[in-house]
Design a protein with these regions (language model features):
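Amphipathic alpha-helical interface segments
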Residues: 1-112, 127-136, 142-214
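Long, charged low-complexity segments
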Residues: 118-122
């Protein structure tokens, strides 16, 4: 079972849990390969939460540029959940498992979004293939006056497409929620066997900001 706690982060990056009726420490359990699925599901759940928030904001945007930005970010976040990672990265989801028994061809829609991410957003394969070059001709003087290219890129019916992606995100998030509950319980039982004294010997859990260019 998942619980949510309020917390503060002190100057050293240590997390301080709030609102508990007992003295507590929040200790960091050393990483193990057997926790990989749990780490992966946690990250996927976070990505899906962001994707859904981006989609909601995209629907409420009046400006096309803002809507496109939120939509593209949502597609990229969703696709990450199903995309293979490097050797030591997160475990990817299987669309076949997640959408098993769901009607209305969710896997077909899912594949379209993965293709959209790969060919339009992360790369420009389709836009490159669709790029056109034109020559402007002066018919009367029978000569070319210059070269021009239309500034066009792929467009989508954003409102309908957002609704479809939102449904896929919700289905995936529900599936992840159930799997997270199972995985958390397995990990809890495994870690609890170590006993209080061993666990109390672990370091306080700290977080650090890993973003940045330096």
């Amino acid at each position: 079972m998942k619980y949510k706690f309020d917390y503060d982060i002190n100057e050293s990056g240590m997390l301080i849990l709030k609102g508990l009726a007992f003295r507590n420490r929040y200790v960091e359990v050393p990483r193990e390969d057997r926790f990989r699925k749990l780490y992966s599901y946690i990250l996927i759940d976070i990505d899906l939460s962001y994707a859904l928030e981006f989609l909601v904001r995209g629907i409420n945007m009046y400006d096309d540029i803002d809507r496109i930005c939120y939509f593209q970010m949502a597609v990229i976040k969703y696709s990450k959940c199903y995309s293979p990672s490097k050797k030591d990265g997160r475990s990817q989801l299987s669309a076949t498992k997640v959408y098993k028994g769901i009607e209305e061809d969710p896997i077909g829609c899912h594949n379209k979004f993965i293709e959209m991410r790969n060919k339009y957003f992360a790369h420009d394969e389709n836009d490159f293939k669709a790029s056109k070059l034109g020559a402007i001709l002066n018919i009367d003087e029978r000569k070319m006056m210059g070269i021009a290219y239309p500034q066009m890129q792929a467009k989508f019916d954003y409102f309908e497409t957002i609704a479809i992606l939102m449904k896929l995100c919700e289905i995936t998030k529900n599936w992840i929620g159930e799997e997270l509950d199972k995985e958390i319980e397995c990990v809890r039982l495994y870690v609890e066997q170590r006993g209080f004294d061993k666990l109390n010997g672990y370091k306080d859990l700290k977080i650090s900001n890993t973003w940045g260019l330096v």
